[in-house]
Amino acid sequence: MTNQKDIFSYLVPGKCAHLAGIGGVSMSPLAEVLHGMGLKVQGSDMNDGPSVEHLRSLGIPVAIGHAADNLGECDFVIRTAAIHDDNPEISGAVTRGIPVFERAQAWGAIMKGYKNALCISGTHGKTTTTSMATHIFMAAQKDPTVMIGGTLQLLHSGYRVGKGDTIIAESCEYCNSFLSFFPTVAVILNVEADHLDFFKDLADVEHSFRRFAELVPIGGHVVANMDDEGARDALRGISQPIFWFSYDDPAAQCRAENVVWTDGLPSFDIYIRGSYYAHVSLRVGGKHNVMNALAAASAAYLLGDSGEAVGLGLATFTGAGRRFEYKGSFHGADVYDDYAHHPGELHALLEMAKTLPYKRIICAFQPHTYTRTKALFNDFVKELRVPDVVVLAEIYAAREQNDIGISSMDLSREIPGSVYCPTLDKVTAALARIACPGDLILTVGAGDIFKAGEKLLKEEK
């Protein structure tokens, strides 16, 4: 990996950037941003798909598969955390003396050009909260630059390049990526054990988030969830002042008051330092989304946005792509898709789903990575015993090889009545067989489980 300070000399018009893993959720928007800055952009990915097709429509060439020849005459390489040193493009670049930078280094360098860098982190809730903040700052007419790890309907993509002085960036802890950022406002939603293929344990994860908070300069702000034990532990004794948000703890600077639930959707007042700030009516359900809204509102307050902008922005937010996203109806059963791939995210999703007026919850779950499934096995079992019916797809490998001999079959043995499906086609068939009018069908996971739901809906037609 090349030193981050060196990347600034490469992010100039006319330079040619090769992005290895260009179709990824934060790589494809990076490709577009660099393209918009006047760089020549090319890349490669193991899989074709909508993001790759979109990049090609912009005139960005994308090769499928990784090979040293893909580098062409590029000036530098940017890679995702999933692209390792033994990848032929990385080893080829090293052999030729072409500098290799991490994706986070590129985003960090871009971030340095903004007065306000709002970086939103947490084990889960990052995409939703970043999307909420985007709605608020757009309502406040701040014209922000945005990088989200998902698709936001407001933007019709996962990014935008604004002309304002604020950048809003989803900030991931995996491989300490967010430590390459330059936050002026660092938001920490929650801290739990995850990415245990990289981190040793929860204490290691907490240490990473603490280092992230310590990046905030004097005059900046650390915003954190007082209701989350991991966040409190990570920040205990830190020198930076902390702006806490909470559902109802009076010790927090920001909290919700007068919460009313109507058909599973919350409306509430936001009080900051004891004074009324904003009224919010959310169009997404779940207590976790109240917390996400409080986090986004806290950041907006600290950066000078009005309470009116907060209320208006959040009133128009209907969810981010793959976050309880309505896909359609199959013989009277509603089909939703969600990105949840950690037990904490599953818990929040299923708790929210239980408040909705469906006869049964059918959850088609695809675990994401072998190491996460093994490390959090008992937690997954606990959460997957909540739905009325569970259909288990095989584990989505992502960046891993199955060297530990684990399978979704192992989960199925611990979940009474569950159905194990080795292929997505079998998941679709199982859902078609099981579903009844009035059911809620959830396709859940960070891999390609959504395809099973989409195929189910095609069968309806």
Task: Provide a role label for each language-model segment.
Residues 1-102, 106, 229, 257, ...:
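N-terminal leader/targeting and accessory segments in enzymes
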Residues 8, 33-36, 56, 70, ...:
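Phosphate-binding loop of NTP-binding sites
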Residues 10-18, 26, 30-33, 37, ...:
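Nucleotide phosphate-binding/pyrophosphate-handling subdomain across enzymes
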Residues 39-46, 222-226, 362-366, 387-397:
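Short internal beta-strands
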Residues 44-45, 63-66, 101-108, 147-150, ...:
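Beta-strand->loop->alpha-helix junctions that form or flank phosphate-binding loops
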Residues 381-437:
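C-terminal helical cap/extension that packs against the catalytic core
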Residues 426-458:
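A glycine-rich beta-strand to alpha-helix segment
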